[in-house]
């Protein structure tokens, strides 16, 4: 098995390095990751400038100023030969639960892998201590996927409680919960007297029901949430069609 491994915390982050070490006991692993922290950049691609790479002595490749999506795109289409069998993103230092998946570069890297036709996992730890737990969980999932392929055509978003491996209660299949809308803005003044604005932390959970990713992780379970590239709100299509049929004033051609 050949694994393309990326993240959004940067190539030197402990999460990706510990995950690479664990995965290399199972398969060939090629890291292609940003050279710095690119958290929160979602699915952005760099289209207004060339991208340069730096190959480390161990073969890991850093994309200078690249986004997670850049890294997976370049890894699949130019840098990894033979190509990957699966794309893995993580381990993120912090969860990607509920609305987090909209902004997450970790999820975006997996999304790009799936968009390019590969199975893909995004792995996040609900904290910053037990990366070894998340790495072990990822290895177990990959062994299971190898023996029994998951033919959903979806991205698997994995959130792991920040606990010792022996303290995990198991796995739960979940849906994305949701957070309250974030509103905090932190105002500061730089040394030259100019105002600076920092976007504050995410808000707390709003929908954390029994079948959500929030609830599973809070109760000590690994959360497994299938995600998809297609953002069409299928249930809203007939509502929109009825609205269009009943609406006047849009004009005709």
Swiss-Prot record:
Keyword Protein biosynthesis attributed: no
- List the SUPFAM superfamilies hit by this protein, alphabetically: SurE-like (SSF64167)
Q: What is its EC number?
A: 3.1.3.5, 3.1.3.6, 3.6.1.11
Q: Which GO terms describe its molecular function?
A: 3'-nucleotidase activity; 5'-nucleotidase activity; exopolyphosphatase activity; metal ion binding; nucleotide binding
Q: Which residues form the signal peptide?
A: none
Q: Which UniProt keywords apply?
A: Cytoplasm, Hydrolase, Metal-binding, Nucleotide-binding
**Which InterPro entries does this entry report, sorted A to Z?**
SurE, SurE-like_Pase/nucleotidase, SurE-like_sf
Q: Does the keyword Nucleotide-binding apply?
A: yes
Question: How, per the record, is the cofactor bound?
Answer: Binds 1 divalent metal cation per subunit.
EC top class, in one word? hydrolase
**Catalytic function, reaction form:** a ribonucleoside 5'-phosphate + H2O = a ribonucleoside + phosphate; a ribonucleoside 3'-phosphate + H2O = a ribonucleoside + phosphate; [phosphate](n) + H2O = [phosphate](n-1) + phosphate + H(+)
| Transmembrane spans | none
**Subcellular location, record wording:** Cytoplasm
Q: What does this protein do?
A: Nucleotidase with a broad substrate specificity as it can dephosphorylate various ribo- and deoxyribonucleoside 5'-monophosphates and ribonucleoside 3'-monophosphates with highest affinity to 3'-AMP. Also hydrolyzes polyphosphate (exopolyphosphatase activity) with the preference for short-chain-length substrates (P20-25). Might be involved in the regulation of dNTP and NTP pools, and in the turnover of 3'-mononucleotides produced by numerous intracellular RNases (T1, T2, and F) during the degradation of various RNAs.
Family to which this protein belongs: Belongs to the SurE nucleotidase family.
The name this protein carries in UniProt is 5'/3'-nucleotidase SurE
- Source species of the chain: Sodalis glossinidius (strain morsitans)
Q: What is the lineage of its organism?
A: Bacteria, Pseudomonadati, Pseudomonadota, Gammaproteobacteria, Enterobacterales
